[in-house]
Amino acid sequence: MDASTVIADMVAFMHPDDCDQLFVPSSTRESMPLVPNYALNEDGVDSVKVLMATRNLIVFEAFRPKGAVDRTHMHADHHSVAYQKMGRVRMMIDADTYIVEAGDTYRHPMGVKHQHEALLDSIRIEIKYYPDGNAIESWNALVGGTHTGE
């Protein structure tokens, strides 16, 4: 593997053995509660496991229980695209609100305010794209450390 692609840092919510791999057996990994750095009274709104990490991308699966809602926030360092795998959420993106159901896809560009409210138990697959190549450092700062599930 080219040395420029090697990830030396630990990735929060990703098992250490899975870092910098071309194939990740994530089906054998457990999710962990996440409390993002913008949270107020959101004690583990999502349960997350990182599926893949590179310098520019973080791909994760997130479970959110019915009724859980995060506060309106935005990210200045990355774009997000999400696929709703299960359930239903009310998704506010900028000034628009959408009801997102299983099979739907949505995005919130860098710097755009957004908020999720789980109307049913929900699972999404989210891809965060960091154009500056600081995905791991930014992800670890967002989620408050390097919880790896070891």
For the regions a language model picked out, list residue spans one by one:
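A short, N-terminal "cap"/entry segment at the start of jelly-roll beta-barrel domains
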Residues: 1-56, 71, 143-150
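Conserved short histidine dyad/triad with adjacent acidic residue
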Residues: 45, 58-76
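Glycine- and acidic-residue-biased ligand/ion/polar-headgroup-sensing regions
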Residues: 77-89
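Surface-exposed loop/turn positions
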Residues: 68, 104, 112, 120-122
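Short strand-coil-strand connectors
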Residues: 55, 92-96, 119
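Short acidic-glycine-tyrosine-enriched beta hairpin
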Residues: 94-111
